[in-house]
Amino acid sequence: MTALDWRSALTADEQRSVRALVTATTAVDGVAPVGEQVLRELGQQRTEHLLVAGSRPGGPIIGYLNLSPPRGAGGAMAELVVHPQSRRRGIGTAMARAALAKTAGRNQFWAHGTLDPARATASALGLVGVRELIQMRRPLRDIPEPTIPDGVVIRTYAGTSDDAELLRVNNAAFAGHPEQGGWTAVQLAERRGEAWFDPDGLILAFGDSPRERPGRLLGFHWTKVHPDHPGLGEVYVLGVDPAAQRRGLGQMLTSIGIVSLARRLGGRKTLDPAVEPAVLLYVESDNVAAVRTYQSLGFTTYSVDTAYALAGTDN
């Protein structure tokens, strides 16, 4: 097998090769092997990159692993992909072992879709599932009409003047969350720069009563229309200020966002005429209350992503 090559940065050609690898693998597996944050990191120097090149000099990359640094009390996070035509050669196992060696065993691995090759690799390395992220979907029809309670005003994102309140609520709602917590203006700016960003898709709920501080954000629903998947929208981030919980804001914001997605996707056709437009979301499997709320809104389980770690480690 070709040698493993750790990098702190990737050239433009290497970035393109990794993106092509991800695209080819997604087409075969039906699920992206890495999350969008990994693609966002290809041009940065905030994570480490492990490359496996093909046997032909100057040929395409056939294996890639991204290793992000630890956040908070948790360990590092790795995501990897092997070209479908290069599987069963030990490349994935070798990359995973290299990541474990670099972190002294203190890292997790995301397995998107929890596919058979990922389960087999995890078993061979003595890894066990430590976290599950459920993808749920529902069709964009028969949407419950949202009811906006008294004392709440809804509007969409007006620009960077909203950022301070947006960050305050996000970081309070996701305190301790490994991916969504601890955001700064950098994370917001990166997402505003994405091709899919639409200010009308970022829905904000403000308090409007004598007891509320003027301009206080109660919650938000950041929706996303997938440019590469016609007819598919996403509940990208839904956050409610912990101090404003138990007021039905989460369900209200979810419904408003779904209505917004249905309006924006109404004229778009899916790649498969037999598949109707839909909205997806991700939720932690142990967040039972959220799962039940989404089920009550018509969402059902579509797939499950699993985070694996060495058995017996505190990851």
From Swiss-Prot:
Its EC number is 2.3.1.189. Belongs to the acetyltransferase family. MshD subfamily. The gene is mshD. Monomer. Optimum pH is 8.2-8.5. It catalyses: 1D-myo-inositol 2-(L-cysteinylamino)-2-deoxy-alpha-D-glucopyranoside + acetyl-CoA = mycothiol + CoA + H(+). PANTHER family: L-AMINO ACID N-ACETYLTRANSFERASE, MYCOTHIOL ACETYLTRANSFERASE. This is Mycothiol acetyltransferase. One of its GO terms (biological process) is mycothiol biosynthetic process. PROSITE patterns: GNAT. GO terms for molecular function: mycothiol synthase activity; protein-N-terminal-alanine acetyltransferase activity. Residues 4-141, 152-315 form the N-acetyltransferase domain. The N-terminal acetyl-CoA does not function as substrate in the catalyzed reaction, but is believed to have a structural role. Was identified as a high-confidence drug target. The lineage of its organism: Bacteria, Bacillati, Actinomycetota, Actinomycetes, Mycobacteriales. Keywords: Acyltransferase, Repeat, Transferase. The keyword Transferase applies.
